[in-house]
Amino acid sequence: VTGGLQAFVVNVSTAIRPQIVQSYAIGNYTRTINLMYSLSKASICFLYIVAYPIMLEIDYVLKLWLGANVPDFAADFILIVICITFLNNLNSAVSAVVHASGIMRNYQIVGSLINLVSIPVAYYALSLGHHPTSVFWISFVFTLFMQMASLFILKGIIKFSFLSYAKRVLFPFALLILASFSLPLIPFFLLPCGFMRFLIVSAIAVLGSSAVFYFISLNHSEKLIVNSFVAKILRIKK
C-alpha cells in the first residue's frame, strides 16, 4: 500500500529535483531554497491527497486485497508507516539540496547513527512486552529526529530560515488538512462499508483536497509548476 502511494509522489518530485541541482550549481541559492520549499510541500500534500482516503478505508482495502486473511495489526502498521512516509517525503527535498551541494558527510553520518540507534531501542521495547506497533512508533519518532537533524545540517550548508520553512511548507500542509479532512467523513459514517462507500469517500477526498491544495496551499509560482506538470502528463497521454 505504502509502496504504491510513494511511487505516485516520486513521479511528482522527479520534475523538481533536477531544477534544485541546477540552481545550486549556478549559485542561485535563493531559487534553490524556494524549490526545496515547493518540493517539500508538494511531496507531502500530494501524498495526503492520495493517502487520506486509503487511511479512512484501510480496513476495507485490506479486506478487498487479502480477503479474510488479513494479518493482525496490519491496518495499524500501514497507518503508522504512512505517517513515517510523510516525514520521509519532507526529508527528500532536504536530501536533494544536500546532495546538490556535495557536502554529504555529516548528513550521512547522522542519518546512519539515528537509524542504527532505533534498532536496539525497538528491540528493547518488544522485550518489555510492549505492543507490536511500538516498533513502528519508535521508527516514527526517530524519523522525526532525522528530519529535524537534516534541517540543522542543511542550515550549515545553505542559508535559510526555519520560520520560512514552517510558513512555506508546514503551515500550508496543516491548512490543507484542516480544510479538507471533514467532508469525506460524512459518507464514511453515513454509508455502510463497501465498494460504493469506498468510491464515494475516495472521490470526495481526492477532489476536495486537490481543490484546497491548488487554490489555497500553492502560491502563484507553484501553481505554474503544477500546471506545467499536468500539461506534460496530458501531452504524454495524447
Can you annotate each of these PLM segments?
Residues V9, I33-N89, L116-Y124, I177-L178, ...:
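Alpha-helical transmembrane segments of multi-pass membrane transport and lipid-handling proteins
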Residues I82-I114, G129, I158:
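Membrane-interface junctions at transmembrane-helix termini in multi-pass inner-membrane proteins
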Residues V1-T14, F46-V50, V81-N88, F142, ...:
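Transmembrane helix-bundle signature of multi-pass secondary active exporters and lipid flippases
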Residues G3, S38, A51, Y60, ...:
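Residue-level recognition of pore/gate-forming positions within transmembrane alpha-helices
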Residues G156, F160-A166, P184-K238:
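Membrane-proximal transmembrane or re-entrant/amphipathic helices at the cytosolic face
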Residues R105, S112-M148, K155-G156, F160, ...:
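Membrane-interface helix-loop junctions in multi-pass transport and translocation proteins
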Residues T2-S40, S95-A100:
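Helix-loop junctions and terminal segments of transmembrane helices
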Residues Y37-C45, L79-I82, I109, W137, ...:
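Internal alpha-helical transmembrane segments of multi-pass membrane proteins, especially GPCRs
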